[in-house]
Amino acid sequence: AVKLQPNGGSVQTVTAPTTPKTVYVNMTTDCLYAKPGETVTPSVAYDGGWMHAYTYIDYNNDGKFTPKVNDNLSIEAGSDLVSFSFYGGNDNENGKNSAGTSISGSGRNTLVMPAFTIPADTKPGMYRMRYKVDWNSIDPAGSIDQSNPIIGNGGGIIAVMLNIHGAYANVND
């Protein structure tokens, strides 16, 4: 299951089927909701060990997720990667989460992703959103490292839709 919780709001959940076990699950018929400028916290439910969680939003609706991370492991402006629990560039080294908190040792075994803010200038509309569980990889398609590929490490990807809407909506009959 993947979740999104607006700051002070109710948790929204999309539950993916557990069988058959696949790396990619298309749940784009399910939708989560957020407003421009709203702070939200993503989360995943995962049974397994020593993995990390990543969330992406295709803000420019170009059909691909483009992660951009600075040398200090902070998320670059304009990145489709919006939150991650751990990234270190090297499997055996310390790293950070997307809030910039340094993580080392057994603390690297975390799926807890920091909250992020939907940019205030985001136009209302439908956006593809991707949740990924993987080991130390910001690649939105999953690690292809021969020593620990997503297909072999027990990770997975769930795709959903994100409905960005204003505080009010007009309903037409």
Model regions: which residues?
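A broad "non-catalytic interaction surface" signal
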Residues: 1-173
